[in-house]
């Protein structure tokens, strides 16, 4: 149903997506195991991700989207052809990822739809130690008398990011069933391997053919994320001196002990993930490998500003060099790898991308919550390979855990926001 609603000074169409419909779709998708594998070098990292890609491909074709395809890497591409008389409307992409995180099992997910959440503590049936409560998850208050979905206690739920997948699919169905709603070309993209940092590794941007995009991979209803960390990796390689341990006095220099000394020299009460928040950056050791002769320490380095990122590298290198200098004969190599950059640097050059998203969220009846991500998204990478791409909410909560949950009305509002956003691009072109 289309209802014309006036909010001066403009008229726009109110959109309604059924929370029950999007919930049914979401619950089907989460039962497909699509966990990605951080140890794999294949694309996709796990073949089972393609199981959901194939389902989405079939369902898109079933909606009448005839160009829907799935490629060898598990990416799903589709186009809802524009129906406006305007010729200058940019093609807009809506993207979500099919994989779930390696942090928690995604096998045999059993979703439970709590249709009218009453505020009571929820004990998950398959592991009664898993308890969901308003005191631990205050956002539950926003869903009193509405539906929420949990897993059964043994697995994650998969709302990250099958809620985004469900919202995009429900919006696609809306467009196909309501041809009077005007829009330009809408590009749909479902990616594998976002959770292991490879979501854009094999995407064909020419095939996608979108000028601007939006990932559906966010939290509370109304949230809009247009800023991420800038990210790098650092590897410190320490070379010692190895001799027979029986004759090693005053000769052997153990690289493993030096690596331990470097880690011990790092600040204890600052500069780490466990001691920082908001807009603070950090340095985080993630792996130590080696033998007495040679050892490596791998770090991730994060800051919202590229200049801040470099300052972290300079400080880390100085600390390590001072430690290594205390071991006669030892040497050190410090290498940097760029991972991704703050998407805000690109989005600020295209302010309409975020402005239109804010307007769409408001048209969906929500308050915009502008947020920064203390991490990265596929949108970070898309923004730097030609498709400026902020991140829009879906409602996911307690992600990557057995207590993951989502509100059905949030997913419905995400789908409505997609429709409004597509209409705004048509109106403003």
Regions found by a protein language model. Give the residues of each.
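Glycine/charged-rich beta-loop-alpha catalytic/anionic-binding loops adjacent to active sites
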Residues: 140-155, 239-243, 364, 396-400
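Short beta-strand segments
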Residues: 93-97, 189-191, 214-217, 237-239, ...
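Short, Lys/Arg-enriched N-terminal segments with co-localized hydrophobic residues
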Residues: 1-13
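Metal-dependent amide/peptide-bond hydrolase catalytic core
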Residues: 256-429
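Phosphate/diphosphate-binding glycine-rich loops and adjacent basic-rich segments that engage nucleotide
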Residues: 215-241, 245-248, 252-258
């Amino acid at each position: 149903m289309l209802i014309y609603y006036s909010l001066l000074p403009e008229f726009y169409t109110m959109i309604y997506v059924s929370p029950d419909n999007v919930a049914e779709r979401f619950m089907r998708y989460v039962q497909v195991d699509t966990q990605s594998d951080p140890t794999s070098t294949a694309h996709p990292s796990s073949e089972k991700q393609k199981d959901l890609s194939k389902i989405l491909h079939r369902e898109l074709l079933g909606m009448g989207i005839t160009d829907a395809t799935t490629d060898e890497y598990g990416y799903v591409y589709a186009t809802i052809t524009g129906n406006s008389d305007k010729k200058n409307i940019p093609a807009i992409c809506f993207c979500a990822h099919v994989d779930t995180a390696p942090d928690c099992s995604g096998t045999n997910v059993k979703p439970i739809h709590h249709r009218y959440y009453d505020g009571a503590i929820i004990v998950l049936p398959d592991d009664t130690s898993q308890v969901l409560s308003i005191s631990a998850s205050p956002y539950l208050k926003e869903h009193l008398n509405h539906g929420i979905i949990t897993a059964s206690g043994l697995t994650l739920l998969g709302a990250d990011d099958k809620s985004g997948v469900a919202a995009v699919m429900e919006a696609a169905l809306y467009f196909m069933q309501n041809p009077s709603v005007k829009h330009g070309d809408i590009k749909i993209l479902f990616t594998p391997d976002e959770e292991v940092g490879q979501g854009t590794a094999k995407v064909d941007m020419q095939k996608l053919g979108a000028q601007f995009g939006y990932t559906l991979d966010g939290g509370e209803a109304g949230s809009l994320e247009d800023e991420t960390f800038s990210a790098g990796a650092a590897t410190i390689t320490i070379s010692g001196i190895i001799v027979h341990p029986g004759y090693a006095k005053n000769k052997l220099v153990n690289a493993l002990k030096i690596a331990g000394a470097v880690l011990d020299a790092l600040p204890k009460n600052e500069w780490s993930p466990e001691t920082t928040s908001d807009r603070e950056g950090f340095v985080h050791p993630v792996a130590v490998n080696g033998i007495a002769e040679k050892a490596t320490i791998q770090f991730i380095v994060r800051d919202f500003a590229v200049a801040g990122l470099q300052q972290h590298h300079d400080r880390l290198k100085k600390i390590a060099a001072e430690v290594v200098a205390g071991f006669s004969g030892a040497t050190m190599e410090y290498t940097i790898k760029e991972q991704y950059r703050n998407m805000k640097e690109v989005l600020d050059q295209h302010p309409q991308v975020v402005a239109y998203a804010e307007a769409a969220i408001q048209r969906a009846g929500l308050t915009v919550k502008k947020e920064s991500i203390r991490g990265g998204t596929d949108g970070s990478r898309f923004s730097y390979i030609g498709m400026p791409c902020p991140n829009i909410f879906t409602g996911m909560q307690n992600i990557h855990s057995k207590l993951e949950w989502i509100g059905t009305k949030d997913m419905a509002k995400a789908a409505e926001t997609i429709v409004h956003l597509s209409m705004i691009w048509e109106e403003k072109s």
